[in-house]
């Protein structure tokens, strides 16, 4: 290590990787574990100066493999951190040099040499970025660090969207939940969202994994990875010095970039409308662009405020009238200058996104851990305002997996920055603690400031919904609604706008799959808010600090619950049309085995059922239900709170809403009372309700409450179903569905005692019904 380096103690209020050891010279258990933050030896060349260059800067070399078109954004992302070091009086703490094959500059430096810190670039089809480091295990001093970037997140259309769906569906689930899903695979989104041909293989792999892990399927248990990068918790446990073993920031960027590619024309039109103000004067080039986009995608009209739409259409109509009066002389129309395109994406979009990604990974190399609360500081109205746009980052930390900001009408007055444009308040504070020379206790005492909130990887499966990957805004419900509006508009233009002449129709299926991923991301994001509580890391005595656990206001939980219901359970949420299904196909190539095994026709029922089943799991899994049950006691009895009964009843009423009118009306097999998608949902929900009515111990302390409420709901549901069956106007599909549901409920309620109920996952135990033996559980 460096001469004169002084180790610095770690503190849970600020996120650094740590080097830890056990001091057996201490006899107080709280003192035996010693933790030091991982940091570079950076100090002023002249301590007497308020602003001084460093004695020895951190130098990063941009590898010659980084494409020239991206190099300036890579450099920009690295240098973002100099702002934080200037705040503590060190100017130029980080320096950047290019390695260039043409000029020979720095080509004598080997990226594998530990004396040099490199930003490396790899071309592949995987969205990856990582910032590992080498640390002195005695002191926590960082000795060497590198960043590895791939361009896979830019090459987004080769992504396996099925895999991403299951990852998004289980985002935020705890080790206990993942272990429970392992024992109850029919509830498991990872299985339900997988292609049917792969499900048996997944179960076999899961069984092998259970032999090694206490909470199978959750990465926090994988301490023994042979190589870092196998799961998201690599580098954190089972080692003296933590490192960034895996980072998924680029994975979110892949989905964001895919959505941007699909919505590019829409975004341009919305920006044009927003920038018009009271001045309808536009160039010929602009008018031609607007005319073309409105003709190709009429759904765009619904997205523009009425006053601005009227101005746009008036300007286009007047221009067309002028053309009609022309003597026949053709007017050459020059395409609007939209700036340079890089790999099919506007430079003004992908450039800042890359700079943010680089800043995130460089943050890891200077010791910082993830902070998933960074994006929760500001509302969408603030983010999409002139006061913030281009002036300050809308996230307090580049160490978050920040979502992308594509503004839809009603989400602010103007389109704000799409990406985070620099380090935030938390980042500056973290550098002040790790590298500054001020009073460390005073620095840490500011932790209760909302702009300095911190939550990291192990918090992301806890009860705090703000510690969330890929979300955005102080109220993520607004962001989720914004994303679903974007999804609807993109789906409306899939056939006529996204798939161009000469394109394969497989683009329609890929495009639709991308929108499903964004939909799942929004559902999972809001599912985390049901049964949630804010968690604070502040300590007693910190100014303005709150209780460490604060139940999320019931209004927010109910709004989140309703969002999941509206956007997962209703047919309209999926934007399915006969035209879409007729065109959503696949290409058949032997170099892409997944396409060879895929059906040319989209298996829409299976895909939607996977989405709906996953949403039910988000709301009704034991961890969520138990938290709702526990949090009832956190709230005084004279105050409103979400209850287990309300949660189950709300889901029940929404899933079976068709029964409210008792089957009145006229129905046919082609226009049934209950659609095919909703029949699948209702059968799935009935399975869950029966499971919950037969206590298998999975719901812990809430088991008896869940059992009794679920049994009551089953009795009420049977009465409603039987009443609807008396209607003589039911179609054949609905009648058969309801008859089967009624019989299943009756058999379930007849069960007086379940033998071996706690082992239902083993294929279903024998059910001993009073007066009946040997009947299989329904």
What is each of the regions a protein language model found here?
Residues 87-102, 370-381:
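Short, glycine/acidic-rich hinge or "gate" loops at secondary-structure transitions
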């Amino acid at each position: 290590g460096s001469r004169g380096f002084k180790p610095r103690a770690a503190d849970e209020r600020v996120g650094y990787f740590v080097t830890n050891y056990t001091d057996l010279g201490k006899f107080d258990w709280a003192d035996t574990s010693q933790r030091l933050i991982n940091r570079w030896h950076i100090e002023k060349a002249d301590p007497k100066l308020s602003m001084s260059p460093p004695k020895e800067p951190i130098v990063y070399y941009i590898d010659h493999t980084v494409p020239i078109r991206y190099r300036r954004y890579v450099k920009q992302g690295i240098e973002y951190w100099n702002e934080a070091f200037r705040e503590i009086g060190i100017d130029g703490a980080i320096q950047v040099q290019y390695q260039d094959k043409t000029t020979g500059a720095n080509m004598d430096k080997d990226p594998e040499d530990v004396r040099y810190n490199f930003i490396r670039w790899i071309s592949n089809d995987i969205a990856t970025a990582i910032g590992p480091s080498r640390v002195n295990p005695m002191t926590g001093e960082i000795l060497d660090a590198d960043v590895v970037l791939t361009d896979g997140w830019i090459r987004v259309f080769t992504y396996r969207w099925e895999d991403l769906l299951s990852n998004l569906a289980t985002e935020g689930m705890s080790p206990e939940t993942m272990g429970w899903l392992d024992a109850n695979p029919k509830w498991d989104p990872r299985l339900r969202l997988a292609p049917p041909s792969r499900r048996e293989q997944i179960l076999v792999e899961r069984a092998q994994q259970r032999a090694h892990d206490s909470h199978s399927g959750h990465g926090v248990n994988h301490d023994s990875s042979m190589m870092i990068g196998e799961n998201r918790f690599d580098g954190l446990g089972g080692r003296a010095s933590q490192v960034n073993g895996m980072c998924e920031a680029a994975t979110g960027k892949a989905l964001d970039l895919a959505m941007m590619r699909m919505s590019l024309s829409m975004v341009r039109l919305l920006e044009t409308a927003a920038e018009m103000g009271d001045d309808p004067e536009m160039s010929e080039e602009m008018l031609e662009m607007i005319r073309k986009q409105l003709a190709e995608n009429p759904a765009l009209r619904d997205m523009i405020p009425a006053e601005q739409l009227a101005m746009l259409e008036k300007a286009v109509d007047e221009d067309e009238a002028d053309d009609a009066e022309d003597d026949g002389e053709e007017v050459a129309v020059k395409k609007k200058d939209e700036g340079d395109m890089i790999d099919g994406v506007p430079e003004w979009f992908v450039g800042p996104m890359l700079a943010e990604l680089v800043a995130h990974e460089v943050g890891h190399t200077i010791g910082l851990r993830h902070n998933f609360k960074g994006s929760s500081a500001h509302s969408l109205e603030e983010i999409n305002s002139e006061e913030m746009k281009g002036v300050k980052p809308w996230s307090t930390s580049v160490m978050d997996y920040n979502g992308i900001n594509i503004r839809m009408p009603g989400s602010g007055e103007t389109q704000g920055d799409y990406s985070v444009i620099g380090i935030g308040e938390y980042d500056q504070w973290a550098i002040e603690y790790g590298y500054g020379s001020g009073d460390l206790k005073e620095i840490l005492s500011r932790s209760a400031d909302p702009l300095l909130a911190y939550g990291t990887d192990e918090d992301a499966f806890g009860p705090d919904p703000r510690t969330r990957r890929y979300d955005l805004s102080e109220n993520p419900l607004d962001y989720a609604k914004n994303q679903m509006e974007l999804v609807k508009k993109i789906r409306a233009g899939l056939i006529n706008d996204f798939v161009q002449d000469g394109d394969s129709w497989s683009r329609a299926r890929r495009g639709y799959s991308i929108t499903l991923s964004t939909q799942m991301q929004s559902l999972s994001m809001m599912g985390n808010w049901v049964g949630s509580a804010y968690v604070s890391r502040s300590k007693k005595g910190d100014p303005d600090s709150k209780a460490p656990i604060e139940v999320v206001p019931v209004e927010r939980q109910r709004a989140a619950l309703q969002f999941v219901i509206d956007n997962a359970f209703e047919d309209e949420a999926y934007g399915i049309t006969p035209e879409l299904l007729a065109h959503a196909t696949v290409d058949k190539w032997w170099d892409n085995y997944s396409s060879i095994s895929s059906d040319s026709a989209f298996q829409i029922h299976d895909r939607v059922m996977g989405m709906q089943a996953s949403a039910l799991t988000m709301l009704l899994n034991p961890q969520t239900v138990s938290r709702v049950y526990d949090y009832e006691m956190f709230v005084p009895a004279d105050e409103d709170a979400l209850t287990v009964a309300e949660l189950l009843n709300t889901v029940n009423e929404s899933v079976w809403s068709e029964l409210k009118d008792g089957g009145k009306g006229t129905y046919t097999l082609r226009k049934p009372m209950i659609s095919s998608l909703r029949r699948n949902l209702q059968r799935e929900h009935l399975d869950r309700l029966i499971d919950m009515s037969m206590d298998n111990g999975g719901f812990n302390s809430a088991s008896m409450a869940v059992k009794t409420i679920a049994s009551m709901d089953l009795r009420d549901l049977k009465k409603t179903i039987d009443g609807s069956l008396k209607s003589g106007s039911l179609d054949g599909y609905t009648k058969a569905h309801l008859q089967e549901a009624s019989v299943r409920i009756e058999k379930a309620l007849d069960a007086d005692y379940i033998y071996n109920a706690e082992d239902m996952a083993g294929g279903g135990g024998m059910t001993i019904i009073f007066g009946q033996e040997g009947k299989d559980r329904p």
